[in-house]
């Protein structure tokens, strides 16, 4: 069993976030890691998830053909093309309640969609 929670960010926004979050003094940190630009361009330079969703054999899924079988993996999409998450790197005491509500609702919508497809 599987499901996909996809965080939708444009490649340009992904590179911007990568540069903003990278801390050269803590490169092993989960919250402040950075990926070299060559890797960002070579491995994350395009986004094919929209194509995979739009060409899937079943709505709300990504079709995967493997080992002689066809799987329809449910997907929930958290649209973060307009940044909803960067504020979360600050101390929680500094978080704006309206921003917390916005990101919470957006993630809940994506996970509810994903879970509904998973339970079918």
Role assignments for model-derived ranges:
Residues 4-120:
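Conserved GTP-binding G-domain of TRAFAC-class P-loop NTPases and closely related GTPase folds
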Residues 1:
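Substrate-engagement module of ASCE P-loop NTPases
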């Amino acid at each position: 069993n599987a499901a996909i929670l996809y965080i939708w960010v444009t490649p340009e926004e992904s590179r911007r976030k990568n540069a903003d979050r990278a801390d050269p003094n803590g490169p092993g940190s989960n919250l402040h890691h950075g990926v070299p630009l060559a890797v960002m361009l070579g491995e994350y330079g395009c986004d094919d998830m929209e194509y995979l969703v739009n060409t899937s054999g079943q709505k709300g899924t990504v079709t995967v053909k493997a080992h002689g079988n066809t799987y329809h993996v449910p997907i929930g999409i958290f649209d973060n093309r307009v940044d909803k998450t960067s504020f979360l790197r600050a101390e929680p005491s500094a978080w704006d309640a309206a921003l917390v509500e916005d990101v919470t609702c957006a993630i809940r919508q994506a996970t509810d969609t994903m879970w509904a497809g998973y339970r079918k």
